[in-house]
Amino acid sequence: MAIRWADGTDSDMIAMDDTYFPVIVATWVGAPTEKSVRAYFQWLHEMLARAKRDSTLFINITDASLAKTPAPDVRRLIAELTTTLENAGADKNAVSAYVVVDNPLIRGVLTALGWLHGSMNVTHVATCKEALDLGLRQLGRARKPAPQGLDPAKWRRPERARRAS
């Protein structure tokens, strides 16, 4: 497919990129809203269905380095939708999840969500390159081919997300 955008308001967006499936990258910009979070989780369910259909595993990378802390109701929604995704089998089809985060507040939110969801295999990293490198290694260990054309050193955020930051 390619890049899909979830826009909540003028100040938040999520770029959802499956160009290199089974490696998927979501770039969060601003404070997520209910609308953008629901669109993101709908996309994750689609990626899970695709992985099941293709009998493969996927690497889920979330670039939260441009994100702002979500409101409490949005954090609750993220927790609820994460549970729904786990119940749909994400823990069996996602090799690993990597979150690029440098904001201590965002890291705290993610850590709290991790405590609520013990089955989540989430690794926090400093850069997208690091997440992509680790993800490709994980695919290799799972004996799954790396997506053609994905070079972690050359990967860039979508232009619209770069402009918004």
Q: Each predicted region: which residue ranges?
A:
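Amphipathic, Lys/Arg-enriched alpha-helical "gate/interface" segment within cytosolic domains
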Residues: 1-165
